[in-house]
């Protein structure tokens, strides 16, 4: 009986391990069919967007950083502080704080502003293929610096996206190999289930043999 109990525990443990393995296979199949391809598609579009926007900026931004030109409203500004001041004025004059409003253009990118009511901040979006967002502060010149930092940061974000894409592609290839692997303890589980079935059969036979036969007494 003790052997039967020990074997039953081992079989239950192996069955639980197999159920976990099966669940893992289902997750891998789901990732292979949907999740990884979707992530790859999004990252490829993001990479293409960064590449396009970086090329737009390269073509439209003068090599000489002192040669500044920004359109705000209907005016062209060549002074950074004046351009930054005009941006703040445009923010203050916005009719609706709930909608994104286009206020100008810089380096071939549309400049759009919206109000983040949760953080109580104005947010500028440089819009090309992608939207490149940053918070506006109260310093006119500082906002122009922030804008340039966003443009300069595109290369780093492109590199991050490319690294993520390579990682997801690697995860997809790994998942395709892992999903082919059978449950490693399948043979052991089958063997112990057969042993347990044999022990159960023997125990049932012993119980039947030990059951006393009660004969009916003759009726007088």
Regions found by a protein language model. Name each.
Residues 206-214:
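Intrinsically disordered, low-complexity mixed-charge segments
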Residues 1-77:
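C-terminal accessory region of SF2 helicases/translocases
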Residues 2-31, 95-206:
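Mid-to-C-terminal oligomerization/interaction "stalk" domains of large proteins
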Residues 42, 49, 64, 189, ...:
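Short, surface-exposed, charged/polar-biased interaction segments
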Residues 214-220:
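Non-Sec secretion/translocation targeting segments of pathogen effectors
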Residues 56-120:
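C-terminal helical accessory/scaffold domains
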């Amino acid at each position: 009986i003790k052997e039967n109990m020990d074997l039953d525990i081992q079989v239950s443990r192996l069955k639980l391990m197999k159920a976990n393995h099966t669940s893992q296979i289902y997750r891998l199949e789901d990732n292979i069919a949907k999740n990884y391809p979707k992530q790859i598609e999004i990252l490829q579009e993001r990479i293409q967007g960064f590449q396009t926007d970086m090329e737009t900026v390269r073509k439209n931004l003068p090599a000489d950083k002192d040669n500044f030109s920004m359109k705000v409203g209907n005016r062209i500004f060549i002074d950074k502080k004046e351009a930054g001041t005009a941006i703040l004025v445009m923010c203050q004059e916005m009719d609706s704080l709930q909608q994104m409003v286009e206020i100008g253009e810089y380096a071939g990118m549309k400049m759009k502003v919206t109000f983040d009511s949760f953080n109580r901040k104005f947010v500028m979006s440089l819009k090309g293929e992608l939207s490149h967002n940053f918070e506006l502060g109260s310093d006119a010149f500082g906002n122009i610096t922030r804008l340039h930092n966003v443009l300069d940061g595109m290369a780093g974000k492109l590199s991050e996206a490319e690294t993520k894409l390579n990682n997801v592609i690697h995860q997809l290839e790994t998942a395709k190999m892992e999903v082919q692997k059978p449950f490693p303890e399948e043979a052991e589980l089958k063997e112990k289930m057969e042993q347990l079935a044999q022990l159960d059969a023997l125990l049932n036979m012993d119980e039947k043999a030990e059951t006393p036969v009660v004969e009916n007494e003759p009726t007088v």
